[in-house]
Amino acid sequence: MADIDARLREDVHLLGELLGNTIREQRGAEFLDKIERIRKGAKAGRRGSAEGAEQLSSSVDGLEDDELLPVARAFNQFLNLANIAEQYQLMHRRDDAQPLPFESRVLSELLDRLKAEGHQPETLARQLSKLEIELVLTAHPTEVARRTLIQKYDAIATQLAALDHRDLNSAERAQITSRLQRLIAEAWHTEEIRRIRPTPVDEAKWGFAVIEHSLWHAIPNYLRKADHVLHAATGLHLPLESAPIRFASWMGGDRDGNPNVTAAVTREVLLLARWMAADLYLRDVDNLAAELSMQQASDALRASVGDSAEPYRAELKRLRERLRATRNWANASLTETLPAPEAVLRDNRELLDPLLLCFQSLHECGMGVIADGPLLDCLRRAVTFGLFLVRLDVRQDSTRHCAAMTEITDYLGLGRYEEWDEQTRIDFLLRELNNRRPLLPSYFKPAADTAEVLATCREVAAAPAASLGSYVISMAGSASDVLAVQLLLKESGLQRPMRVVPLFETLADLDNAGPVIETLLGLPGYRSRLQGPQEVMIGYSDSAKDAGTTAAAWAQYRAQEKLVEICREQQVELLLFHGRGGTVGRGGGPAHAAILSQPPGSVAGRFRTTEQGEMIRFKFGLPDIAEQNLNLYLAAVLEATLLPPPPPQPAWRTMMDQMASDGVSAYRAVVRENPEFVEYFRQATPEQELGRLPLGSRPAKRREGGVESLRAIPWIFAWTQTRLMLPAWLGWEAALSKALERGEGEVLAQMREQWPFFRTRIDMLEMVLAKADADIARLYDERLVTAELQHLGAHLRDLLSQACNVVLGLTGQTQLLAHSPETLEFISLRNAYLDPLHLLQAELLSRSRNREASLDSPLELALLVSVAGIAAGLRNTG
């Protein structure tokens, strides 16, 4: 641990020094001294020095308008460089004497444990190979880092790795340091913020770039290592066509609350994915053709290519031509609708079969060592990514479908669908689903919103089945929500089953999830349209915004239990899709612990979850780190499947019922029932300003109104910026305190010790409380909140203090995260750079609110940079 601290501080110091050189060169020594005075003041202030805190405060207050942006940029860059150093610590080269990180050894340790518990090697190999884990990449309004800069940051991490070699001579070390200096200068002189909002297509391209630069390399590497670990433990190999982890995407498919995602955008993104996949395989096949110059071949390969002197190259040449045809057609189809020529690859077998033929031939001819190199990697990619790279989900709000159905029934003279009761809707929808004639005449001319819903359904019907994931219905609350989408898809020409997935988001909808699915499974004809598991999406963000995380977490747990029970009774397989965010307030947290804390039976070999924009970058942005996170998913889903946790004891359920009730009351008393709260929220946080910033393609609000109209992401993002972190903990302080007052401390201790669900919740709560900072929150209040509302901020900070104390009591520590000195070190390192940014942001908000500033003014740009810097420093945003 001490070694890691020393190395981390060494790297941060080096990167900071190189950034300082760059700043001095551009703005002079006097300006750099000002930055240093601010940084040292922050550092001393953190150690309790009143003089240091005063130095920090007076230095920031004294900044001229034209200094605000470069100062904000300096601390933003410091934090991004600290992130790079921290990421590098997670994957740095280790000596043989150093233990492997947990992520690298988790699978082998799990397999040993499973064998010791009596699981047969064949069972382990079979279960591992047929796991179905799907990570759904989503765009994110708070992923503010530009792709250009991300690539430079990745290059900096590579140079840190080069610097880590022990046997470097002084000239080599100087050369690497010089490269680092150049990269940091490039980053400093690159504008870090987009001036215009990204389009949904831009966001999709960002997702494809993560695949191209990281996941494309990580997938074969993690599978190669998993195969090695499996073979060492069981003597068996991972089958060639096993892909335990695949990827889907919402980028270009998620139109919920985003009018910019149209049917045309979805079509464009599907074509871009095909183009990108063909392009990536072409690069692989070009390299393979250069390497596979051998002449000896199997009879099967000879039968395919004839008497060619270079049979492998001949087979790959044909595949290369088809990949080129596919890429060219996808590119041309972006501007006009064209029929696909014969040569275009349509089925994944057409990609896999030539590669398998070469692979098997090499093995048959005694060249297995060649087959098991880049050719095996290409095969693994082809199985994982297929011809379409990712499966695109479509998501739309249930109210849009209801409005479309109302317009249709109104037009047909059947009455208004929206006014019908649930049973009337179900009867009508089932009748029409089973009717062979179309519901709508070809000359029906719907209004714009309905036309867009129908156009999206037509794109779904026209797209290849393998290019699509699920059609997700947000704010679903009834069986008719699912049937309505099935009918709209049928009317649009869909002739195959499609996964239509209700997303249960509010507390009431989560409580009703079981009965809705039970109703659906009991309807005549529904199961024939299912063809596969019943997929249900659990919403973490909106349920937490609605009721606080105490009640939301328990509602999510109980909903999953009920769904498992119903599907087991109905003999239908269940796939739970977890809509988690990056933050604790949106269901985020370490994936490994989260998966192991799911209700027993809810994983069962299948797991689907969203990966949010800013977390995609931290978890999958670099190949080595992506590999570690893929390992964690693999091990956690295998463990949750074969070693599910025991069901909670009745006393624990009673306790959680009471705590959920106390938690939701305390949460809503502040957020919903206090008439001053919304005004305080808008004064104390940058919520209003966030709506103006070009942070993502989706608007920050669903509609005008109070907290309930806000999307969950800006709601949490705003509180994160001020370090109050309110949505992640509010309610827990009351729930836990009241349990202790009732003398139930022993039950709480038992729950934390024996129940993974509760332990994980408390661990995540502790993490967020460690990042919260009442002094920083007070600073925003003093600068921005009117005198008559300051009492509310003081009350919230008292509640924060109560939450910290009760968690310390529960964990038996004197300091939050005392059991994790490494995490404390990472937080402490950042605070010296975060504190000035918070102070600066409060100052910028004050100046911005007191004058009309245009969006591209230095003031607004500095504000945006401060937002980005704080997001980077805290490593989780919305």
UniProtKB/Swiss-Prot annotation:
SUPFAM superfamilies in alphabetical order: Phosphoenolpyruvate/pyruvate domain
Catalytic residues, chain numbering: H140, K545
Source superkingdom: Bacteria
The keyword Iron-sulfur appears for this protein: no
Catalyzed chemical reaction(s): oxaloacetate + phosphate = phosphoenolpyruvate + hydrogencarbonate
InterPro entries: PEP_COase (IPR021135), PEP_COase_bac/pln-type (IPR022805), PEP_COase_Lys_AS (IPR018129), PEPCASE_His_AS (IPR033129), Pyrv/PenolPyrv_kinase-like_dom (IPR015813)
Single GO term (MF): phosphoenolpyruvate carboxylase activity
BP-aspect Gene Ontology terms: carbon fixation; oxaloacetate metabolic process; tricarboxylic acid cycle
EC number from the UniProt entry: 4.1.1.31
GO terms for cellular component: cytosol
Keywords: Carbon dioxide fixation, Lyase, Magnesium
Cofactors named for this entry: Mg(2+)
Family under the similarity heading: Belongs to the PEPCase type 1 family.
Protein task: Forms oxaloacetate, a four-carbon dicarboxylic acid source for the tricarboxylic acid cycle.
Name listed for the protein in its UniProt record: Phosphoenolpyruvate carboxylase
Species in which this protein is naturally found: Pseudomonas syringae pv. tomato (strain ATCC BAA-871 / DC3000)
